[in-house]
């Protein structure tokens, strides 16, 4: 960023929630807020920026163990190239959703296998990468239960739709894959 003439501040996350907190506290002070990390770090940053009311742009340098979201929107897997794209002002427009009071632009999900991303220790992610999530998912198979859910889309609009069912897994998604495992039809996303 410095090579491109950008004045930068660097904050290092040490625990879950830090990216959300930092983005919420400081987004109004910057033209661009960017993170280097995985899909979870990016999701936290989005929630923090949107909940702060800031109008800044956001950037994502995919540097985590899966980087599913970055891949699905065509970001470079090379962190230097991804950083250059941000510094050069390259942008794409993305939708942001709200799910139970939290903002997201990748996926909000519930049910089977969704706890894996939170329960895998960081050191195992560092050692095994994406495989750590798969192994946790296999471990979680024995505890899968359905949940009764009610989903309201376009609430208050003429196109409002209510879906109420018992589901094992559900997701609201803005990408062509979930967790690097479930691939979706790009025309339906």
Placement of each model-derived feature along the sequence:
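ATP/NTP phosphate-donor binding region
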Residues: 1-33, 43
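Catalytic core of DAGKc-family lipid kinases
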Residues: 4, 11-13, 51-172
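Phosphate- and divalent-cation-binding pockets in alpha/beta enzyme and binding domains
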Residues: 18-21, 44-45, 68-69, 115
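Short, solvent-exposed amphipathic alpha-helical segments in soluble enzyme
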Residues: 25, 50-51, 121-122, 186-188
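Active-site acidic Asp-centered loop
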Residues: 36-37
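Short Gly/Thr/Asp-enriched flexible loops that form oxyanion-binding sites at enzyme active sites
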Residues: 41-53
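Short amphipathic alpha-helical segments
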Residues: 46-49, 71-73, 183-184
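Internal anion-binding site segments
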Residues: 166-189
């Amino acid at each position: 960023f410095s090579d491109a003439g950008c004045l930068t501040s660097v904050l290092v996350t040490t625990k879950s929630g830090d990216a959300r907190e930092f983005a919420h506290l400081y987004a109004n002070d910057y033209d661009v807020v960017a993170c280097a990390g995985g899909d979870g770090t990016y999701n936290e940053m989005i929630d923090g920026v949107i909940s702060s009311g800031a109008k800044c742009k956001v950037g994502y340098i995919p540097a985590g163990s899966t980087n599913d979201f970055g891949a699905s929107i065509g970001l470079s897997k090379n962190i230097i190239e991804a950083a250059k794209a941000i510094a050069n002002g390259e942008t794409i427009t993305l939708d942001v959703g709200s799910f139970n009071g939290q903002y997201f632009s990748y996926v909000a999900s519930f049910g089977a296998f969704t706890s894996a991303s939170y329960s895998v220790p960081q050191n195992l992610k560092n050692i095994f990468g994406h495989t750590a999530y798969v192994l946790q998912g296999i471990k979680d198979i024995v505890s899968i239960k359905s949940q009764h859910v009610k989903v309201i889309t376009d609430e208050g609009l003429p196109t409002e739709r209510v879906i109420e069912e018992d589901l094992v897994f559900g997701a609201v998604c803005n990408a062509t894959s979930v967790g690097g495992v479930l691939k979706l039809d790009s025309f339906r996303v």
